[in-house]
Amino acid sequence: MANSASSRKRARQAVKRNKHNSQIRAKVRTFIKKVTYALEAGNKEQAQNCFTIMQKMLDQAVNKGLIHKNQAARKKSRLNSQIKAL
């Protein structure tokens, strides 16, 4: 339990940041799923549209330190190659 005023404040900030970061990670995962579902349905145009939005969200998550840059690059590369294969 936080005892000093500064440690209580840091605990509040950590909870707030954790909630915000969780929301961003959830949005990224949602758009990855949207691209995957569009690929499974064979809808190349929808997959491409969702992919461009997903790229932006992944890059933002990388800049905020939520996702490692290599993980984001790997996801983008694999999904893009699947879109091209359609």
UniProtKB/Swiss-Prot annotation:
Query: Does the entry feature the keyword Chaperone, yes or no?
Result: no
**Residues in the signal sequence:** none
Zinc-finger: present as a keyword of the record? no
List keywords of the entry alphabetically. Answer: Ribonucleoprotein, Ribosomal protein, RNA-binding, rRNA-binding
Pfam families attached to this UniProt entry: Ribosomal_S20p
Biased composition regions of type Basic residues, renumbered to the chain: 7-25
Example of a GO cellular component annotation carried by this entry: cytosol
User: Gene3D superfamilies annotated for this entry?
Assistant: Ribosomal protein S20 (1.20.58.110)
Q: Region annotation Disordered: residue ranges?
A: 1-25
GO molecular function terms noted in the UniProt entry: small ribosomal subunit rRNA binding; structural constituent of ribosome
Q: Which biological process terms from the Gene Ontology are attached to this UniProt entry?
A: translation
The entry's family comment says:
Belongs to the bacterial ribosomal protein bS20 family.
Query: Briefly, what is this protein's role?
Result: Binds directly to 16S ribosomal RNA.
What this protein is called in its record is Small ribosomal subunit protein bS20
Origin organism is Vesicomyosocius okutanii subsp. Calyptogena okutanii (strain HA)
Question: What are the top taxonomic ranks of the organism?
Answer: Bacteria, Pseudomonadati, Pseudomonadota, Gammaproteobacteria, Candidatus Pseudothioglobaceae
Name the gene behind this protein. Answer: rpsT
